[in-house]
Structure formats: structure tokens, C-alpha cells
Amino acid sequence: MSTASKSPAPSRRVTKLLIRDLAQAVSPAGTHAPIRGREAMRSVDVVEDAFILCEGGRISAIGRMRALDPLDGDVEELDGSGCAAIPGLVDCHTHAVFAGSRAEEFELRSGGATYEELHAAGGGILSTVRATRAAGAEGLADALALHRSWMLASGTTTFEAKSGYGLDRDTELAMLRVVREAGGSPTWLGAHAVPPEFADADAYVDFALAEVLPEAAKIAEAADVFLERGAFDAAQARRYLEACRGAGLRLRLHADQFTEAGGVPLAIELDAVSVDHLEATGPDGVRALAQSDVAAVLLPVAALFLDRPMPPGRALMDEGAIVALATDFNPGSAFCESLPLVVALSCTQMHMSPAEALAACTVNAAHVLGRADRVGRLAPGYEADIVLLDASDWRYLAYHLGANHVAQVIRAGTPTA
């Protein structure tokens, strides 16, 4: 692939871009979202010897090179020889705004300490809260810019990021603003942990709803809660989520990461957009999700990082649930920004096919974020967010474990540096 001489500077917006001579242009089949069911999830559209034409930041045409008509006007060209093009990847669950490091805790866990033990001792999430509060808005913006560059380099063009490492009014709102200003989808994770200045979870929920929610609802697109032993119970989660729904926020839950604590039925009852993690979800929860419109967002890196069982991805797929994939990128339990690694783990550890995994981190992840009408597919009218892989077969995204085959990322029709 020859890109060095034809890629414009990242600050220059391209009006019309032709990506030509692609080995493949690949996208989940169909036009609807979300995608569910084995047959639909395994259907991909593959155009060989392909071109993609982008105009005004959107895809205007895709086809075989032999069908390409002469183009009028000033057109930037990008040589895609030997490359497969896929939709820009969508990471619908991250904690990408944080300060500090938890490398020391990683070493302690490697020696046998558990995530829950570290959290109970004042480490874990609370150690990141201390560092994040001290960073200030400018420090948080710088941290997100760095983390965002890592994500972009691995093919993520659309991302969500949560608050939840401030747990006070000013830091929580600063985190949400930083995400919005970076072009991400901000989620208020006000109920992530109980900060040390509060005696109990109920008192903290009172504070969060009274003092933070009114302003958070003006910035965030969704609200999230960590429903788990040692964090917030089902009654506290319900109170928090019902108030957030009343403020106009879409609802999401962290649930069943370590124990089944009522998160799945609560998500279904409250018509949440997603319930995330699900490492501990049993057959009843799988069936209930399959009969609902709540998406199951699976985070295999977190399971690997914490040496936990993988989520029941294959069972959820076979039952017909809406399944999305994400990194859970965070400093403590999933220090990984790579959706290609998530795809590989989903195939090798959760027995998903490459096509299912691709749909789960494009169309279905975009559905979770309310963006499936404009990102997640290579199709005319969609935003021109495109990833070129330096492989002629798109399945190398999953097949070459640990490698980064992302050769070029196009965002809104403009190649990035």
C-alpha cells in the first residue's frame, strides 16, 4: 500500500477522497441495526478489487474498480493496493479519562491479590479517583488525547468514555466535558464506587443525584452504574437509574462481572440500552436478554486481565441476544485500547466467528451509542470512517493474534497521520 505521498496532513480536511484498488471492502451485511441471530451476524458484504469514494466526509459510492466512472473536480487518491477496508471500529465501553497508573496493583494481582481485595483496601478504583481529582481539567484533556491516539492507531474511530473516577461534582463534570470536546460519547458513571468522604452508598447516591445529575444530564448521553458486591446493590442502582432516566439520559449498567446481583432483570425492567460485562451471567440471564432489546456488551479483555471466566458470548449469540463488543479500556482491570485484540479474543475464547465479532464492534456497538444510522458500516450515506488493514483478507483482524494490521485510518473522509 502506498500512502506516504498521498495522505494529506491531518489538519487538512479533504472534500473528495478516492480509495482505490482495494483487495477487499468489507462491511456487515444489511441496512438494519442492531443485528442479532447467527445467520444475520455472520453475513458480510465483500467487494473485491474495490474502490470507496468519499465526499463531504461521507461515503458516496462503493464498488468494483472496473465500474468506477471518471471523476470530475479535485480528488485526492489513496492507493489501497493489497489492503482490506473495514468500517471504522466503535468502542462503546471505555473508561479512557483517567490520571495515574496502577502498575503496582497489577504486580500485586500477579502475586495473588484479587481485584476485590485491592478495592476493599482503598486501592483499585479509589486510587485512580485520587489521581484523577488531582489532575485538573487540562490534565484530563491531555490524558484523553493520549489515550485517544492509541485507540485511533488500532482502528477505533468512534468511542464512548465514562466518568466515574471523580466521584465529586467538579471532577465528574470535567470528565464529561473532556469526552464531549474530544468528539466522544460521554456517559455519566456517577455510581462507580463510594468515595471515602461518604459513610455509605445510600448517602453518596443522595449526593450524586442532588448535586451532580442536574448538570451531568446537560453533557452526558447516558448514565451507568456499577451494580456489584462491594459497589452498589440493586435497590441503589434502581434509584440512581430511575432518576437518570427522568433527567433524559439513556441507561446502561455494569453487571454480573463477579456475581449475579440482579443487574440483568433490572436492565430489562428499566429498558436500558445495554448491560455490560456479564462474566457471571447464567443460563436464565442469557435467555432473558435474548428475549429483550437490551444489548449485551461483552468485555473479554477484562475477563482475561482479571483471570475471570469469559462472558457467555456464544450462548448469547445462539439465543439471539443483541451482542456488542468493547475494550473496557481502564487503568485497573483492562489496560488495553485494542479492539482488534478484543475481536481475536472473542473468536478464540468466546467462539464467535470473525464476521460476528466484526458486527459486534461496528454496527451493534454503534447501536448502543445511538449512532448506528451513521457509523459502523461501509455504505453510501454513512460517515466516511474507514480502516485499511495491511492484509488482503479482512479476517487477519482476528486471525493474527496480537498484531496491529491497521495501516491507515480515515475519519470523516480524511486520512489521519
Where are these regions (language model features)?
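N-terminal metal-binding scaffold of metallo-dependent hydrolase/deaminase domains
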Residues: 1-70
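Active-site-adjacent C-terminal substructures of enzyme catalytic domains
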Residues: 250, 259-377, 389-394, 401-403, ...
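Metal-coordinating catalytic core of metallo-dependent amide/deamination hydrolases
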Residues: 123-145, 149, 157-261
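Metal-associated gating/positioning segment near the N- to mid-region
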Residues: 80-143
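Conserved beta-strand scaffold positions in the cores of enzyme catalytic domains, especially
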Residues: 18, 75-79, 186, 409
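Divalent metal-coordination and catalytic microenvironments
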Residues: 22, 52, 57, 82, ...
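Short peripheral tails and domain-boundary helices/loops at the edges of structured domains
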Residues: 406-417
